[in-house]
């Protein structure tokens, strides 16, 4: 779910499902083993090229730096960046 006043940069990927690499070898095909909701709350920003994984909430006013890989929730008015994304500051 994407709420109001959200800014999403170019080439952002929201991944709602994934699989373990072992599943490909075992079954010879991709079997979805992880799926979940992604929520982007009001007024948050997601920078260009970021990847958001399943079961993540980007809380209100949060900022995700370009190219970040978000593996867990981003607290309100927090700035995250990196692979995996980690807190680097707060929105003032």
Predicted ranges, named:
Residues 1-56, 83-84, 91-92:
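Flexible, glycine/small-residue-enriched loop-and-beta-strand segment within the central core
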Residues 59-60:
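Short coil-to-helix segment of the ABC ATPase nucleotide-binding domain corresponding to the Q-loop/switch region
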